[in-house]
UniProtKB/Swiss-Prot annotation:
It comes from Emericella nidulans (strain FGSC A4 / ATCC 38163 / CBS 112.46 / NRRL 194 / M139) (Aspergillus nidulans). It comes from the Eukaryota. It is found in: Nucleus; Cytoplasm. Residues 314-422, 448-470 are annotated as: Disordered. GO terms for biological process: meiotic cell cycle; positive regulation of transcription by RNA polymerase II. This is Protein pacG.
C-alpha cells in the first residue's frame, strides 16, 4: 500500500496531462450536448470535465389532439375532467348506534339445514325493538359522548311498566326439508313457527314476557262465567303467541323463498332486572330472543334458527328514583318522540290564552220570557245596598217614553272617572224580588222588603218598572213593552229618584256593575223556557212555571237593567 494517496479519487478521471495519453481521438468523435452553461472550477487541461463532451439535442414532439369529425373551434384548449365528488360526511353516529342497539343479531343455527336436494339452506331474520328505550348512564362508566360508542358510556334501559313491540320479517327457503343431527341422521321438518322469549344474563334463566291486552275484561263479563276456574283463567297473564310460518301462505311471490312479517305489540317484561347500578359484577340484563322452531316428523320441537337483542336493563321503580342518572333518549325510539311532543306542548301552553270573562259579558243574548212588572209602592231600604251621587235628576220633559233597546256595559274594561263631580246621574243597586209568580210581587207581609229601581243614560229612551219582594233575592228589572203604561212608570221612576237622593253614598267611584256582572245565557232550540237569577259573577237557570209561561207568551223581557255607565 506504499505510495497510495488517500486523497486521490481513482474512480474519477486521471489527473495526468492529455499530452501524455495515447489515442485521444475518441473524444472528438463524440457529439456535444446542449447543457446549461455551468463552468467547472477545475482546469480543463488537467481534468476531463463535462464541458468537453457534446451530445445531440433531441427535441420532444408536441402532443396533438386526434382529429374529430367536425372542425374544433378551440384546438388549443383541452377538455378538463370533472373532479370526483367530495366524499359525503358520515351521518350522525348516534343514529347508527341506536339502530344497532335496538336491532337483533345475526342468525345462529344450532343444526345443519338441508333442502330437498340435500344442499345447505339458511334462514334470514330481520327484527327491531320499538318502545320507550333510552341510554342510561352507568355509575361505573363514563358519561356518553358523541364520539364514543354508547356501549362504553351507557346501556340500553327501559322501565318495566312501559310497553314495547317487535317488528320485522323472517325469510325461509321453500325447499327447506331436513335437519342433520350430531349423529348424521336426517330428520324431516313438518312445520315451522316463530317464538319470542327472554333470558337473564347472570344465570341464563328464562324471563317471562307478557302480552298486555287492549282492554281489561269487565267485571260483569267475568261474573257471567261459572266456576272459580273460569274466573282464574281470565286473570292469567298471557304470553305472546307464536307466529306460524306456513310455506303455502307466504306473502312473497318468490318461488324459492317465503317472507313472513313479524309484529308483536303491547309486550311487557314481567319482572325488572336486579341490582340496577349497585354492583357491576352483579348487574343483571335481559336479552330478547327470537327463535324459529321446527316441528320434526318424530313430534319433537327444536329451534333451528335464533337471533337475540342487545342487553337491556329493566327498571322497576319510578323515574324519580333515577333523577341523578343521565338519560339519553334514542332518536329512533318512542322516548325521543314523547320528549319532543312534551316540549312542543309546553311551548303551546305558554302562547295559548284562555277566553276572558269580558268577552262573555259583551255578548248579547235575546230571549222571550213573561213580564213580572207591578206597580208596588217602594219602601225605604238599608244604606248598604244603595248607591247614589251628588247630582239630582232633571225633571222629565215628556210623559210618553218611547221604547228602545239599550244595554248597560258591565265590563271591567270600561274606564270610570274617579271624581264625583263628573257624574251627572245616579244609580242604585238594591235587592228585589226574582219570583216568577205575580203573587209574590204583592206579598208585603215581611215588612223589610226592598225597593228595586234602575236608571239609564237617557231617561227619555227607557221604560222601567219597579218590583218589590223578599230581601234574600237580588235585583231584576224588566222593561215594559206597551207604551200605555209609560205614564205610571215615569211617575214611579221620579218618586224613587227623589227618595234616593237622601241615601248615603258608600261607594262614590264605583257603580253596581263592578260588583255584579251579568253573563248572558246560551239558549238552544231544545231547551225549555228558563229565567235567570241575577247573582254575583254567575247566572243560575230557573225553570218557569207552566201557567206563567202560557199567560205571558209573546212578551219580551230583559234579564238585566240598563244602568248608567260613564
Amino acid at each position: 500500500m506504499e505510495g497510495f494517496d488517500t486523497m486521490a479519487l481513482p474512480y474519477l478521471a486521471s489527473p495526468l496531462s492529455l499530452g501524455n495519453m495515447q489515442g485521444t481521438d475518441y473524444l472528438n468523435a463524440l457529439q456535444g450536448m446542449d447543457l446549461p452553461d455551468q463552468r467547472s472550477n477545475f482546469d480543463s487541461e488537467t481534468f476531463v470535465s463535462g464541458d468537453d463532451l457534446t451530445f445531440a439535442h433531441l427535441s420532444p414532439q408536441t402532443l396533438k389532439r386526434f382529429s374529430s369529425g367536425y372542425e374544433d373551434s378551440f384546438p388549443e384548449m383541452v377538455t378538463s375532467f370533472d373532479p370526483p365528488p367530495p366524499a359525503e360526511p358520515p351521518a350522525d353516529s348516534s343514529i347508527d348506534h341506536n339502530n344497532k342497539l335496538l336491532s337483533f343479531s345475526m342468525p345462529v343455527y344450532p343444526w345443519t339445514l338441508l333442502d330437498y336436494s340435500f344442499r345447505r339452506a339458511s334462514i334470514s331474520i330481520s327484527a327491531q325493538l320499538h318502545g320507550m328505550f333510552f341510554l342510561a348512564e352507568s355509575p361505573w362508566t363514563t358519561s356518553p359522548t358523541e364520539n364514543a360508542p354508547p356501549q362504553q358510556g351507557a346501556e340500553l334501559t327501559c322501565y318495566r311498566r312501559n310497553l314495547f313491540q317487535i317488528t320485522g320479517s323472517v325469510t325461509l327457503p321453500r325447499a327447506l326439508r331436513y335437519i342433520i343431527t350430531d349423529t348424521g341422521d336426517r330428520i324431516p321438518i313438518v312445520a315451522h313457527e316463530l317464538t319470542v322469549s327472554a333470558t337473564e344474563s347472570v344465570e341464563g334463566n328464562s324471563v317471562k314476557i307478557i302480552s298486555v291486552p287492549w282492554k281489561t275484561p269487565a267485571a260483569n263479563d267475568a261474573g257471567k262465567d261459572t266456576g272459580n276456574s273460569s274466573n282464574t283463567a281470565a286473570k292469567v297473564e298471557k304470553e305472546p303467541p307464536a307466529i306460524p310460518l306456513d310455506m303455502l301462505t307466504g306473502q312473497d311471490l318468490d318461488a324459492d323463498y317465503a317472507t313472513f312479517p313479524i309484529a308483536w305489540k303491547r309486550l311487557q317484561f314481567r319482572v325488572a332486572t336486579a341490582n340496577n347500578g349497585r354492583r357491576k359484577e352483579l348487574q343483571q340484563h335481559f336479552v330478547v330472543r327470537l327463535r324459529v322452531v321446527a316441528t320434526l316428523s318424530t313430534g319433537m320441537k327444536t329451534p333451528i334458527c335464533e337471533v337475540h337483542s342487545g342487553p337491556v336493563i329493566v327498571r322497576g321503580r319510578s323515574p324519580r328514583n333515577f333523577q341523578s342518572r343521565k338519560d339519553l333518549p334514542l332518536s329512533g325510539s318512542a322516548a325521543a318522540s314523547r320528549k319532543n311532543a312534551q316540549a312542543a306542548a309546553a311551548s303551546n301552553n305558554l302562547t295559548r290564552t284562555s277566553p276572558s270573562l269580558t268577552d262573555k259579558a259583551k255578548t248579547v243574548v235575546k230571549s222571550s220570557s213573561p213580564e213580572t212588572s207591578s206597580n208596588g209602592v217602594p219602601q225605604q231600604s238599608p244604606p248598604n245596598w244603595a248607591l247614589a251621587t251628588n247630582s239630582t235628576l232633571p225633571p222629565p220633559t215628556t210623559t210618553t217614553l218611547p221604547h228602545s233597546s239599550v244595554y248597560s256595559q258591565s265590563s271591567p274594561e270600561f274606564s270610570r272617572p274617579v271624581e264625583a263631580h263628573r257624574r251627572t246621574t245616579s244609580a242604585i243597586a238594591a235587592p228585589i224580588n226574582l219570583s216568577l209568580l205575580d203573587d209574590d210581587s204583592l206579598n208585603l207581609s215581611n215588612g223589610d222588603s226592598r225597593p228595586h229601581t234602575s236608571f239609564s243614560n237617557d231617561l227619555a229612551s227607557k221604560s222601567l218598572s219597579v218590583d218589590s219582594g223578599r230581601p234574600v233575592k237580588m235585583r231584576k228589572v224588566s222593561h215594559s213593552m206597551p207604551q200605555a203604561q209609560s205614564r205610571s212608570t215615569s211617575a214611579t221612576f221620579l218618586n224613587t229618584a227623589n227618595f234616593q237622593q237622601m241615601l248615603p253614598v258608600p261607594f262614590t267611584s264605583e257603580s253596581a256593575d263592578v260588583l255584579y256582572e251579568y253573563f248572558p245565557l246560551g239558549l238552544e232550540d231544545w231547551q225549555g223556557p228558563v229565567d235567570a237569577v241575577y247573582r254575583p259573577h254567575v247566572v243560575h237557570h230557573t225553570n218557569m212555571p207552566q201557567m206563567k209561561y202560557i199567560t205571558a207568551r209573546g212578551q219580551s223581557k230583559r234579564y238585566f237593567a240598563a244602568e248608567d255607565v260613564f
